[in-house]
């Protein structure tokens, strides 16, 4: 990210107003722009020069060239190390990397082996992306990483295989309804694994609390209630993020298979599935990613009693505090 370039002057977080949903949608669309995968080392070196000039007061205004430089660094470089993130695991590669495993998971008629393979592939990709973009100042131990990985794979495979076995046995449900429920099994598996993974990775925050800050950016204290809200919203965001690509294409494909795709070859149906997933990913993902703001505000009186009555550095009572939701 651009923040990896040192300098005394803070960078603007975004060119858009992140306090509004539309601003967050535009910001999410920008940081996941796949054209940033074409960024070269020469482009990055030039981008660093521009950002450095701004952070040292040599560049006074946020010009279009500044925003492009920031976009290139935000989508390509790790914020802590300043090193280039491996291409498949960058934010700008998010849609393309996930496209392969999503098409695999949503392929109709997968057997047990296929279901297990694609759920494993999806969780492996998630772990690789999280590891490549993780906070390097608080690295996760190998044992923690393996525990979370095993739990996520177990949850996703267990839910997928369990529901694949359960749905055909449901009574008083029409065959068409069973077909639809069967197509939504991958969604249930991915969501379950995502929720398990969030609470495993961030359980320590709930137990110890997270830092909350006043409007000046000064730490007020630590709050377990704020931590639960942050982790809970992150878990919910995993559900929301998965919904467009894991729900809309399967439902449309069921309809198409009863109409224009009826009797067509498996290859044609697979191409149609790929097209549906691609369009949904590129168009709907920013709307899902932008639902929750990264920086959350909450009234101080809704947190622990020991935080009530706190004052800022000017001696004024603090009404609202802010915290980072995390990912």
UniProtKB/Swiss-Prot annotation:
<keyword id="KW-0029">Amino-acid transport</keyword>
<dbReference type="GO" id="GO:0071454">
    <property type="term" value="P:cellular response to anoxia"/>
</dbReference>
<keyword id="KW-0812">Transmembrane</keyword>
<dbReference type="GO" id="GO:0140300">
    <property type="term" value="P:serine import into mitochondrion"/>
</dbReference>
<feature type="transmembrane region" description="Helical">
    <location>
        <begin position="179"/>
        <end position="199"/>
    </location>
</feature>
<dbReference type="GO" id="GO:0006730">
    <property type="term" value="P:one-carbon metabolic process"/>
</dbReference>
<keyword id="KW-0496">Mitochondrion</keyword>
<dbReference type="GO" id="GO:0015075">
    <property type="term" value="F:monoatomic ion transmembrane transporter activity"/>
</dbReference>
<dbReference type="GO" id="GO:0005743">
    <property type="term" value="C:mitochondrial inner membrane"/>
</dbReference>
<dbReference type="InterPro" id="IPR004686">
    <property type="entry name" value="Mtc"/>
</dbReference>
<feature type="transmembrane region" description="Helical">
    <location>
        <begin position="272"/>
        <end position="292"/>
    </location>
</feature>
<comment type="similarity">
    <text>Belongs to the sideroflexin family.</text>
</comment>
<feature type="transmembrane region" description="Helical">
    <location>
        <begin position="143"/>
        <end position="163"/>
    </location>
</feature>
<keyword id="KW-0472">Membrane</keyword>
<feature type="modified residue" description="N-acetylalanine">
    <location>
        <position position="2"/>
    </location>
</feature>
<comment type="function">
    <text>Mitochondrial amino-acid transporter that mediates transport of serine into mitochondria.</text>
</comment>
<dbReference type="GO" id="GO:0022857">
    <property type="term" value="F:transmembrane transporter activity"/>
</dbReference>
<protein>
    <recommendedName>
        <fullName>Sideroflexin FSF1</fullName>
    </recommendedName>
</protein>
<dbReference type="GO" id="GO:0005739">
    <property type="term" value="C:mitochondrion"/>
</dbReference>
<keyword id="KW-0813">Transport</keyword>
<keyword id="KW-1133">Transmembrane helix</keyword>
<dbReference type="Pfam" id="PF03820">
    <property type="entry name" value="SFXNs"/>
</dbReference>
<dbReference type="GO" id="GO:0015194">
    <property type="term" value="F:L-serine transmembrane transporter activity"/>
</dbReference>
<dbReference type="GO" id="GO:1990542">
    <property type="term" value="P:mitochondrial transmembrane transport"/>
</dbReference>
<keyword id="KW-0007">Acetylation</keyword>
<feature type="transmembrane region" description="Helical">
    <location>
        <begin position="98"/>
        <end position="118"/>
    </location>
</feature>
């Amino acid at each position: 990210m651009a923040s990896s370039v040192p300098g005394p002057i803070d960078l603007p977080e975004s060119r858009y107003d992140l306090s509004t949903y539309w601003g967050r949608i535009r910001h999410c669309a920008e940081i996941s722009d796949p054209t940033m995968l074409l960024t070269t080392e020469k482009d990055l070196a030039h981008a660093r020069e521009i950002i450095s000039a701004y952070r040292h007061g040599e560049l006074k205004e946020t010009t279009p060239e500044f925003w492009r430089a920031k976009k290139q660094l935000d989508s390509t470089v790790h914020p802590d190390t300043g090193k280039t993130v491996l291409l498949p695991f960058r934010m700008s590669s998010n849609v393309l990397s996930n496209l392969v495993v999503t098409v695999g998971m949503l392929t109709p008629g997968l057997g047990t082996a296929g279901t297990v393979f694609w759920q494993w592939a999806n969780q492996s990709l998630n772990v690789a992306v999280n590891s490549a973009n993780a906070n390097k100042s608080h690295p996760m131990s190998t044992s923690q990483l393996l525990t979370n990985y095993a739990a996520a794979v177990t949850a996703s495979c267990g839910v997928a295989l369990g529901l694949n076995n359960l749905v055909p046995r449901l009574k008083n449900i029409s065959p068409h309804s069973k077909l639809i429920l069967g197509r939504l099994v991958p969604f249930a598996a991915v969501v379950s694994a995502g929720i398990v993974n969030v609470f495993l990775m961030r359980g320590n925050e709930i137990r110890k609390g997270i830092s909350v800050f006043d409007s000046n950016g000064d730490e007020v204290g630590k709050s377990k209630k704020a931590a639960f809200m942050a982790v809970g919203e992150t878990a919910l965001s995993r559900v929301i993020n998965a919904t467009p690509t894991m729900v809309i294409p399967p439902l449309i494909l069921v309809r198409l298979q009863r109409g224009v795709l009826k009797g067509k070859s498996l290859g044609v149906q697979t191409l149609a599935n790929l097209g549906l997933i691609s369009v949904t990913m590129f168009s709907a993902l920013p709307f899902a990613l932008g639902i929750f703001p990264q920086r959350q505000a909450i009234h101080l009186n809704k947190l622990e009693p020991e935080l009530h009555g706190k004052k800022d550095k000017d001696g004024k009572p603090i009404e609202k505090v802010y915290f980072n939701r995390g990912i």
